[in-house]
Design a protein with these regions (language model features):
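A short, charged/proline- and glycine-enriched loop
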Residues: 1-2, 168-173
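Thiamine diphosphate
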Residues: 1-141, 146-147, 157-158
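A short, charged helix-loop
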Residues: 152-153
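Glycine-rich phosphate/diphosphate-binding loop of Rossmann-like nucleotide-binding domains
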Residues: 174-186
Length: 186
């Protein structure tokens, strides 16, 4: 994907975008601790035909950069993907100011914004592939902690944007979960 570019807010070690930086340094942009500006620059690069993936902690994506995500990315329906890592309550070590549980609600309230939260590494890889092919704004929440791979045990498992997946059949109850909560629900 030569048109894919990666933006990070001085968190490449924590968000793991350091691997993209090592593989494609000419398409990696460390914007420092300036999340709102990072989203604005990504919106501009989208208008130039690039496919920007903006990476920061969920708290900063849905907090500090919310207005730019809403006005500069989602309303004009630009092809920018916002990845909020360290979402939810799994970031206890980082303190309460970094625990973001409202990011789903905030991002989903924006008209035209696709919101997703993969349950494991396998689903995340498939979700990123799907997002590269999706034309429009999207928000993907990732957790901080390592999670058990649950989708590898499902023969022919295929992630699809906008669709849920039945991971275990049953007859007495339906449990709906996303992200790292899927392994707990199973």
């Amino acid at each position: 994907y030569p048109d894919l570019v990666c933006f990070d807010a001085d968190l490449a070690g924590a968000t793991m975008t350091k691997y993209f930086k090592a593989a494609c340094p000419e398409r990696f942009f460390d914007m420092g601790i300036a999340e709102a500006d990072m989203v604005g620059v990504a919106a501009g690069m989208s208008l130039c035909g690039f496919k920007p993936f903006v990476n920061t902690f969920a708290m900063f994506a849905a907090g500090r950069a919310w207005e730019q995500v809403r006005n500069s990315v989602a309303y004009p329906h630009l092809n920018v993907k916002v990845v909020g890592s360290h979402g939810g309550l799994s970031v206890g070590e980082d303190g309460a100011t970094h625990q973001c549980i409202e990011d789903f609600a905030i991002m989903r309230a924006i008209p035209g914004m696709l919101v997703l939260c993969p349950c494991d590494g396998n689903e995340m890889r498939q979700a990123v592939e799907a997002l590269v092919g999706y034309e429009g704004p999207a928000y993907m929440r990732l957790g901080r902690l390592a999670v058990e791979t649950v989708t590898d045990s499902i023969p022919g498992y295929k992630f699809e944007l906008g669709k849920g997946a039945t991971l275990r059949d049953g007859t007495d109850v339906t449990i709906i979960a996303v992200g790292m909560n899927v392994q707990m629900a199973l």
